Each structure stands twice: as C-alpha cells, then as structure tokens.
Amino acid sequence: MIKIDIPAPNVTITERQQSANDNEPKIKPIHGFIDFHQIPRDKGGIFMFYNIHDELLFVGKARKLRQRIKKHFEDTVSPIKHHRDEVYKIEVCVVDDPMEREIYETYIINTQHSKYNIDKVFFK
C-alpha cells in the first residue's frame, strides 16, 4: 500500500458551551459549535467529523470549507443526516489543489475507516 502523509489540521473545533462571562458578547452556536467562525470561508480543503470518543465518523472535501460543513448539518441528503448529534469535533485541513483534496479524502476514508462515508469506500 502507498503511504501518504496526511496534513495536520489547520483548525480543530469541538462542541462546547460559551462560558458565562458578562464581558463577552453572546455567541450563537451553529449546530452546537460556537467556534464555527474559525473554519475558513473561502478556502478549499478536507474536513473530518469525530465523535466524543475520537472515532472518525465522516471525511469530506470542499472548495469552500465553512459552507460545505454547514451544509452537512442542514442538508436532507447528507450521509450524516441521522448522525449529526454524534459529531463532537471537526478538524479542517486547508488544501488548495483539488486533486490533492480528492486523494487525501479517499486515502483517509479507507485507511482510517470512517464510519458514515458511503462513496470511495474500498475496505468494506
């Protein structure tokens, strides 16, 4: 098997509540994540959803990361539509090249055995 070095995440956010500090403006959570704004809006890359036990649930790629990740939480046809409540952590790697995104996504799905990916699965 070929060996591909997976890039380190540029952004990692976890589901959490905002601390009750009166000095800070209240942040409206997006699907339980108050740090969603840290995910790049106009960058392409790959993203990984994990549960609270750090098990990989889903891997995806996008030309616009934040928009695509939000769509997974709102879309009625997303492969994780019945499992959204399991997502506790999101990792994002900025990858500009579309071909590299495709390679990383397929490699991660099949070497780390993501639980809810349907396409590009060769290990089942």
Swiss-Prot record:
Query: In which domain of life is the source organism classified?
Result: Bacteria
Looking up InterPro entries in the UniProt record yields:
GIY-YIG_endonuc, GIY-YIG_endonuc_sf, GIY-YIG_UvrC_Cho, UCP026568_excinuclease, UvrABC_protein_C
A Gene Ontology biological process noted in the UniProt record is: nucleotide-excision repair
PROSITE patterns per record: GIY_YIG
In what residue span(s) does the GIY-YIG domain sit? Answer: 42-118
What protein is this chain from? Uncharacterized protein YurQ
**Annotated gene:** yurQ
